[in-house]
Amino acid sequence: GIDHIGISSNDQNTPTGKCLVLVTPDAARTMCSTLGISEHLSEKDINFEYLQKSKVFYIEGYMVTSDSNFNSVTKSLDSLEGFGTKKALSLSNDGIVHGFREKFEKILSYRIDFVFGNHDEALALTKTDNIDDAIEVLKEKDFTTIITDGPNGSFIITDGDAIKSNGFEVEAIDTNGAGDMFAGAFMHAMLMGKELHECGVFANLAASKIVQTFGPRLKKEEYQDLSENL
């Protein structure tokens, strides 16, 4: 399970966000979302003391679409100056990267440690049109980039080098949640002290499990079985 610390409810009137996910027979998905209260996060909602004790601060790229949310992100990053918290950013969507490039560049200026994105998001971030060129651009960055590429596996670009982790051949029925599962598994393995290439292999395995089921979550016993691979 998950230990929840410092979570509070400050607004009982604004509705929660909702997301309708449509999955086609080829396992692709599209979403129709209303963000609700999730686009109104403010710094008064954040317990900076708890944040500064965290091992990882994970930022969703979608946070750039709301001025309130973006301000909360930058205030949080400001508060982490001098603390040992690792900072990770998910690019979330290639259209978001294209549309809010200046805000992404602002976040990246805070010495982000890890950037997660898929093939299309990596091309958007680097302004390239193929994955090889994107990797070459990312080799010059001072953050570690992890690029997912569906059944082809993933790339870890760090310190001027690119590490390829092969994917697992499975029959996908729903890709909803695969990127989040990958990032969560990668960071979990990292916090367990695993090497980067081991984190990539474990994250590929976790993502291969979630695409074989409908919905973005596994059952409790499936998570337990998965953790035995670490």
Model-derived segments and spans:
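Short, acidic/turn-prone active-site loops that include or flank metal/cofactor-
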Residues: 9, 35-38, 93, 120, ...
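Alpha-helix termination/capping residues and helix-transition junctions
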Residues: 48-51, 109, 139, 193
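Conserved beta-alpha-beta core of the PfkB/ribokinase-like small-molecule kinase fold
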Residues: 56-136, 143, 152-154
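Short hydrophobic/aromatic-enriched beta-strand-loop microsegments
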Residues: 4-6, 112-113, 163-166
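Conserved phosphate-binding/catalytic region of the ribokinase-like
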Residues: 78-79, 101-102, 127-230
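A short acidic, often aromatic-flanked loop/helix-cap motif at beta-alpha or helix-coil junctions
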Residues: 11-15, 96, 124, 170-172
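Short loop/turn motifs at secondary-structure junctions
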Residues: 1-3, 53, 111, 141, ...
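Conserved N-terminal subdomain of the carbohydrate kinase-like
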Residues: 1-59, 226-230
